[in-house]
Swiss-Prot record:
Role: Transfers and isomerizes the ribose moiety from AdoMet to the 7-aminomethyl group of 7-deazaguanine (preQ1-tRNA) to give epoxyqueuosine (oQ-tRNA).
Pathway: tRNA modification; tRNA-queuosine biosynthesis
Keyword DNA repair: no
Class of the enzyme per the UniProt entry, highest EC level: transferase
Localization per record: Cytoplasm
Gene: queA
Keywords assigned: Cytoplasm, Queuosine biosynthesis, S-adenosyl-L-methionine, Transferase
Documented EC number(s): 2.4.99.17
Reaction equation(s) it catalyzes: 7-aminomethyl-7-carbaguanosine(34) in tRNA + S-adenosyl-L-methionine = epoxyqueuosine(34) in tRNA + adenine + L-methionine + 2 H(+)
Protein name: S-adenosylmethionine:tRNA ribosyltransferase-isomerase
An example Gene Ontology molecular-function term: S-adenosylmethionine:tRNA ribosyltransferase-isomerase activity
Subunit annotation: Monomer.
Family assignment from sequence similarity: Belongs to the QueA family.
GO biological processes: queuosine biosynthetic process; tRNA wobble guanine modification
Length: 341
């Protein structure tokens, strides 16, 4: 299957540069897989499409201020470092820009020496292994010196950093937000629970695997970068109960989908687990857990668009994207949402 098949043209003005004042005022396109019907509404009306006994599974990861700007020692060259994956205390996989001149042993100073990074090794995806030296607590140092790692297509500074977090973000570790969850408010979550719809959380720390561009010509040749995830026994039991009652398990986002499908050892049999996943879901994949998916509108030729196409069918998804462009939906991280049933 060719990567080109997942390309589409998007007018630049449809890339959402900032979030709406109210999270749940986003538009919502609803795709019904069985009938091919498409409905249009707003996100706060999502309850109308859910039934008592259904279960929403959300990702409670929290974005860390993973973008660091420093100076190479002793030249003073400006260096940007993006934290990707914690290996051990103070040792991280990172992306470095400009990267070509960053060799083993090179040092970078951040915040006038409050944090110093030393290149220890190279990674197989063009990144570096960096050892950090600092006093005190690493998280606190990063909170002070780091910036939120907004995607490159967001060119305006986001005034409220909290808007790039879900309202239920708890576990630090992501370098990008699980964007499907950005549409939920505390009030909407409360209303959903009051309707008898279940809500439960798992964790997948969003890393390079989620947003890394596909450079291969053929979809099958792309390799995902692994991301850490946790699916608890409670999640497994709640999903099992939901399935036994004939109700729907709805994944809030592609990250939840990948975590659940990674934990499915066989059809409809989930296992509690924690670890790393490099699962790559594209058309032809046989879904084992989810019955519905809430997601945003994704970049052309991205692994996220491929996952959505695997779930709803490529033709239906590409038709829905055409309609979204025609009706001027807002795209990408701060954009509108889609519910696939």
């Amino acid at each position: 299957m060719k990567v080109e098949e997942f390309d589409y043209e998007l007018p630049e003005e449809l890339i959402a540069q900032k979030p709406l004042p109210n999270r749940d005022d986003s538009r919502l396109m609803v795709l019904h897989r069985k009938t091919g019907e498409i409905e249009e509404t707003v996100f706060k009306n999502i309850i109308k499409f859910l039934e008592p006994g259904d279960l929403l599974v959300l990702n409670d990861t929290k974005v860390i201020p993973a973008r660091l700007f420093g100076e190479k020692i002793p030249s003073g060259t400006r260096i940007e470092v993006l934290l990707l994956k914690s290996i051990t205390e103070g040792l991280w996989e990172v992306l470095v820009r400009p990267g070509r001149r960053m060799k083993k042993g090179n040092r970078v100073s951040f915040g006038d020496g409050k944090l110093v990074g030393i290149v220890k090794d190279y990674t197989d995806f063009g990144g570096r292994i960096m050892q950090f030296e600092y006093d005190g607590d690493f998280d606190k140092v990063i909170e002070e010196l780091g910036e939120m790692p907004l995607p490159p297509y967001i060119t305006r500074k986001v005034e409220d950093k909290g808007r790039y977090q879900t309202v239920y973000a708890r576990k630090k570790g992501s370098v990008a937000a699980p964007t499907a969850g950005l549409h939920f408010t505390d009030r909407l979550l409360k209303k959903i629970k009051e309707q008898g719809i279940g809500i439960i959380y798992l964790t997948l720390h969003v890393g390079l695997g989620t947003f890394r561009p596909v450079r291969a010509e053929n979809v099958e040749d792309h390799k995902m970068h692994s991301e850490y995830f946790e699916v608890s026994t409670d999640v497994v039991n709640r999903i099992k109960e939901t399935k036994e009652k004939g109700k729907k398990v709805i994944a809030v986002g592609t990250t939840v989908t990948r975590a659940l499908e990674s934990a499915a050892v066989e059809k409809r049999h989930l296992k509690a687990m924690r670890g790393w996943t490099d699962i790559f879901i594209y058309p032809g994949y046989n879904f084992k857990v989810i019955d519905g998916l809430i997601t945003n509108f994704h970049l052309p030729k991205s692994t996220l668009l491929m996952l959505v196409s695997a779930f709803a069918g490529k033709d239906m998804v590409m038709s829905a994207y055409k309609l979204a462009i025609k009706n001027k939906y807002r795209f990408f991280s701060f954009g509108d949402a889609m519910l696939i049933l």
